[in-house]
Every structure is written in C-alpha cells, then in structure tokens.
Amino acid sequence: VYVTGALGDAGLALAVAGGKTTVPTEHHRYVQARLERPEPRIAQGLALRGIASAAIDISDGLAQDLGHILERSGVGVRLDVAYLPLSPALIASLNQDAALTTALTGGDDYELCFTVPPERIAQLETVAAAWDCRCTRIGAITAEPGLRPIRADGSAFFLERLGYDHFG
C-alpha cells in the first residue's frame, strides 16, 4: 500500500480554522495552501495504469478512503504508521500521536492511495522516481479483513474515527 505526497496538512488547516490548534508562523501559508489549493496527482494516477491494482484519492481521510478499497476487495491491511509521510509543518504543529491521527483521518489531502502487487514494485519505483512528489510505502495487504494501524514497536495505533463520513 502506497501514498503520494504528505498526509494531514489539509486536516491541520481545518483544525486551525476551527480554532482547535495553531501552527507556527513559518508554516501557516504552506498549510493554508494545502487546504485551499491542493495539487491533484493526475500525472501520477495516469502513470499507475497497469501498475496499481487499486487506487483512490484521499478526500475523506486515508483510513476512510483506504477502507473502501479493503471492503471492495475483501482484504485487510497492516498499516505501519511510522511510515506515514508527514510534512515538517504537521510535525512542528502537533504531538506525534495527534500528527499521525491527523494524517490518517484528516481528509482533503487529495493525495493518492494505491496498492501494487509485489511483482510490479520495481516498475512502480522506476515510474515514481520521475514524480515531483513523494511515493511512500505505508503498509501491506493482508488476508484478514480490516484496517490495522500498527506502531513501530508492533502495538496497535487506535483511531476513534476513520475520517469524514458523508452519511454519519
């Protein structure tokens, strides 16, 4: 399981707008831009044709949107939260657990989340080397259904919610 770019910045901007947190002055413009002017990963999405086995844009939060792939595919994922790509702004603004939670549930990032079979990883690495954004492996598909966020020490990382729910 892979993602493009950095996660959680738009969610951080929403939290700032709602008066729930603040960001250091030097990161304010960046965070606001990530919410107001997200960069759609169109070129990356097109490049993934024939490589990715499933893909979705992250609009409702990584956990929520990845959950759609898992549900439709009848599989699960071990999500290594230590590998989540976090921006310097997110790291400077929140404690570690809050930053990870925001990256997992924040929404409005419009990055891509996608799965790649093992036999196509080398092809992905070649293609992604030319991208103008990061491509980060964050986990692995499992036969056991469900989303399992795991810390570096192997313990579970618990989420109170998965992300934005349009019907909740």
Model-derived features with residue positions:
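Glycine-/charge-enriched secondary-structure boundary and capping motifs
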Residues: 28-29, 50, 55-168
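Short, acidic (Asp/Glu-rich) active-site segment that either coordinates a divalent metal cofactor
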Residues: 1-46
